[in-house]
UniProtKB/Swiss-Prot annotation:
GO cellular component, as recorded: large ribosomal subunit
Protein name in the entry: Large ribosomal subunit protein uL2
Family affiliation: Belongs to the universal ribosomal protein uL2 family.
UniProt-annotated stretches for the region Disordered: 228-273
One GO MF term: rRNA binding
Function statement: One of the primary rRNA binding proteins. Required for association of the 30S and 50S subunits to form the 70S ribosome, for tRNA binding and peptide bond formation. It has been suggested to have peptidyltransferase activity; this is somewhat controversial. Makes several contacts with the 16S rRNA in the 70S ribosome.
InterPro entries (UniProt xref): NA-bd_OB-fold (IPR012340), Rib_uL2_dom2 (IPR014722), Ribosomal_uL2 (IPR002171), Ribosomal_uL2_bac/org-type (IPR005880), Ribosomal_uL2_C (IPR022669), Ribosomal_uL2_CS (IPR022671), Ribosomal_uL2_dom3 (IPR014726), Ribosomal_uL2_RNA-bd_dom (IPR022666)
Pfam families xrefs: Ribosomal_L2, Ribosomal_L2_C
UniProt xrefs under SUPFAM superfamilies: Nucleic acid-binding proteins (SSF50249), Translation proteins SH3-like domain (SSF50104)
Lineage: superkingdom: Bacteria
Gene Ontology biological-process annotations: translation
Compositional bias of kind Basic residues: 254-273
Binding partners and assembly: Part of the 50S ribosomal subunit. Forms a bridge to the 30S subunit in the 70S ribosome.
Amino acid sequence: MALKNFNPITPSLRALVQVDKTSVWKGRPFKSLTKGISKTGGRNNHGRITSWHRGGGHKKLYRIIDFKRNKIDISAVVERIEYDPNRTAFIALIKYEDGQYSYILAPQKLSVGDKVISSQDADIKIGNCLPLKFIPIGTTVHNVEMKVGKGGQIARSAGTSVDLVGKDSGYAQIKLRSGEFRLIPLDCKATIGSISNPDQKNINLGKAGRNRWLGWRPHVRGVAMNPVDHPHGGGEGKTSGGRHPVTPWGFPTKGKKTRKNKRTSKFIVKKRK
């Protein structure tokens, strides 16, 4: 996919850069693989804000994606590549030999008419899904499971992938884009290739309103608030905040390590950069 620039007939078009979607399906999604999704506005079941700066946005249908790839040894043909408003990657509608349809994450260079399969005997080909024990070292993969049968959780965003760098004692060692090296059980599945739409990182929304369409509200700085609202608030005139950056609840932010998951730390061979 290429990037698309616009003739600046309005101020917002001057900066706008989008991904060219001319090769993506322009019709409606496959109806039986969609369901309604309700908005939360960033609120939990008590009505309290748990995710700031969320709200509004265009109405969306949720596309049911097959992250597990549990239909074993049955090949499928790619019917079309589609845009999905719920994620940055494109998705592929596939039709199995038995007539069943499914959505999967579309890897780069997957085309309409290509055949994909989930099998331990599958070829090392873009879109095929195999257990890590049957994938050669050095292969680039995506949609990697962390627990057997749970479905892919690692490398699902646009342009992402991980590298399989080793196998030992029942675990595969993978290298993530962050620089982290992690151990994954060899029976976990992964899909060959990198996720589609790598140019997503180069887009420019062009105006604040486009962010509102995506469901994001204005991000107010702490120094622009009153003391009752934020530790950085208040002061006479414009201030720097007067202290190291903190969250609204007083915890250090902007680079402070917050990971507290000792249970899975044993699976991290090397921490991210």
